Amino acid sequence: MFRAALWPPVLLLLQLLLLACAPGGEGAHDQDEIRFLPGLAKQPSFRQYSGYLKGSGSKRLHYWFVESQKDPKSSPVVLWLNGGPGCSSLDGLLTEHGPFLIQPDGVTLEYNPYSWNLIANVLYLESPAGVGFSYSDDKSYATNDTEVAQSNFEALKDFFCLFPEYKGNELFLTGESYAGIYIPTLAVLVMQDPSMNLQGLAVGNGLSSYEQNDNSLVYFAYYHGLLGNRLWSSLQTHCCSQNQCNFHDNKEPECVANLQEVSHIVASSGLNIYNLYAPCAGGVPSHVRHEKDTVVVQDLGNIFTRLPLKRVWHQTLLRSGEKVHLDPPCTNTTAASNYLNDPHVRKALHIPEQLPRWDLCNFLVNIQYRRLYQSMCSQYLKLLSAQKYRILLYNGDVDMACNFMGDEWFVDSLNQKMEVQRRPWLVDYGESGEQIAGFVKEFSHIAFLTIKGAGHMVPTDKPQAALTMFSRFLNRQPY
């Protein structure tokens, strides 16, 4: 009798679970298949799809899924997220490690010999809603770390409803920059869902800890010759005590003034914050510029966030009522923007006609975003406690937005058992032989790795090294 009383609710639960994936089944995604992609001299031999996944509430997140060129059925599924917050993951596809890269003419796509879909099925997701082609029916784009993690989780579940043939494949979560927050917060949700075959996560030049990022950046800037002895001496005097320096949230007025100067040198002087040794696209920028009726700003708000003038400046812009466009510093987004706003391309990608133009980053999403976490320590410790996930934090070593030293300090602070001492890792460059590609140290279930000479966008700067690293990560090989 007791069992009989429970049986109808169990049936109802099963029905609800089935209804959640009701549109699924192999072939349900056929309407999203990209049949012809403009810009290619020859259409690809692998399948690719573009459409929408259901996020939380009325959010619809745009995805572009490229199947593996190796063997889709046995290759892992890899989620990729770019950061911002408020910037599009299509930047990763079209300028970093996608199967084809946009050319300067904004029309032509060229095949990428170091594409990550050579060995994996890669899902590029534009997140959160309001970014790129993603939208929300209620047009509410103010969000936070927790909401974004949940919405990305819902979208990932919807992906496996749409592509049930991939449910059993190994799943890896990867991303870059502010995805240093997105990926571990999402992974903590995914690890609790036994229907997903989560195997690991990798974050490139990620924001793992605001404090360690700020503190390390000042050392990075000084020892790369950017600050000079006068400023360095003043920083040591006013920001440090007993061999401990606080460059993150120091309230001492002279220290704050010094850090304003450091922030200007690193982010606003004309140096390329994403690659110290690369030129600044468009030349030395002004802090704010105008394009017709639009104010163009370039600060994504991830370094020295506690400086008071930064907060005042951001709120003034938000209240101004002016039309504001967010354009990351020293980057040229014209080619990708021209391509993705071409009507033929939008039609090929199944983008609704009523959606606004695609931009790399969305100012409103960025400026209204609530940063709930100052560090990802608890998330990584939770993932590491499972003792079954392969985790990689990798950094191009000439990036200043999320510098290698801060992420190395962060990994060290997790206090995991050291398995391989810091050593060079090698890439075979054919005729020039094996070369040192960077340095790696490995702990139990987590590794930290640098890519020599790469900036914030590692696959753009060092594509062969990036693919080699990615392959070793997926295949659980020594780096």
Swiss-Prot record:
The active site is at 177, 399, 456. Glycans are attached at residues 144, 332. Keywords: Carboxypeptidase, Disulfide bond, Glycoprotein, Hydrolase, Lysosome, Protease, Signal, Zymogen. Disulfide bonds join 87-361, 239-255, 240-245, 280-330. One of its GO terms (cellular component) is lysosome. Its EC number is 3.4.16.5. Pfam families: Peptidase_S10. It comes from the Eukaryota. GO terms for biological process: proteolysis. Residues 1-27 form the signal peptide. GO terms for molecular function: serine-type carboxypeptidase activity. The keyword Amino-acid biosynthesis does not apply. Gene3D superfamilies: alpha/beta hydrolase (3.40.50.1820). It catalyses: Release of a C-terminal amino acid with broad specificity. It is found in: Lysosome. Belongs to the peptidase S10 family. Protective protein appears to be essential for both the activity of beta-galactosidase and neuraminidase, it associates with these enzymes and exerts a protective function necessary for their stability and activity. This protein is also a carboxypeptidase and can deamidate tachykinins. Heterodimer of a 32 kDa chain and a 20 kDa chain; disulfide-linked. This is Lysosomal protective protein. It comes from Bos taurus. The gene is CTSA.
